[in-house]
UniProtKB/Swiss-Prot annotation:
GO terms for cellular component: cytoplasm; Holliday junction helicase complex; Holliday junction resolvase complex. This is Holliday junction branch migration complex subunit RuvA. Residues 137-141 are annotated as: Flexible linker. The keyword Lipid metabolism does not apply.
Length: 190
């Protein structure tokens, strides 16, 4: 397996880049977040890679960090998520944002990614729960461990993900679930 490539970036044509390594040009599919972070053509780059060998093709996927590659590998294990969809997820959400969405069970955030419908988002949340290390970036803002319960209650009441998140940010430190819901509803009514 090819785990990492270092060479000269010779071409960028989204979502593919071409990296020259000692005279051999490797075409590598990358998420848009990685593509935007790459330097101009002619510069030296290092990409962490994942090789997929199929009957009709050998495909190389590249990432700016090993954490991003690990997340990609976890995503493609989810039923209904292929490599293209996993790239779309990583193009739309950083690893920290994805981890937070999984921890807080935010289907709304995932369904904004092209190719992810409600059922796929729910399956992804179910199958990925607890698989992204220490759930990077998912530390609850104000409501301690009750934040996801409060968020789910607000979403069940018909409030959007954006409205619910804004209300959660206004909650005081360490509030319990029932008090948190009451305060969040009060903030949303204003």
């Amino acid at each position: 397996m090819i785990g990492r490539i270092t060479g000269t970036l010779i071409e960028k044509s989204p979502p593919v880049v071409c990296v020259d390594v000692n005279g051999v040009g490797y075409e590598i599919d990358v998420p848009m977040s990685t593509l935007y972070a790459l330097p101009e053509t002619g510069a030296r780059v290092t990409l962490f890679t994942h090789l997929v060998v199929r009957e009709d093709a050998q495909l190389l996927y590249g990432f700016g960090s090993s954490a991003e590659r690990s997340t990609f590998r976890e995503l493609i294990k989810v039923t209904g998520i292929g490599a293209r969809t996993a790239l779309a997820v990583l193009s739309g959400l950083s690893v920290a944002e994805l981890s937070q969405a999984i921890t807080l069970q935010e289907t709304g955030r995932l369904t904004r990614v092209p190719g992810i419908g409600k059922k796929t988002a729910e399956r992804l949340l179910l199958e990925m729960r607890g698989k992204l290390g220490a759930d990077i970036g998912a530390t609850p803002h104000a409501a301690g461990g009750h934040q996801s319960d409060i968020l789910n209650a607000l979403l069940a009441l018909g409030y959007s993900d954006k409205e619910s998140q804004a209300a959660l940010k206004k909650l005081p430190e360490g509030v319990d679930v029932s008090e948190g819901i009451r305060l969040a509803l009060k903030a949303l009514v204003r």
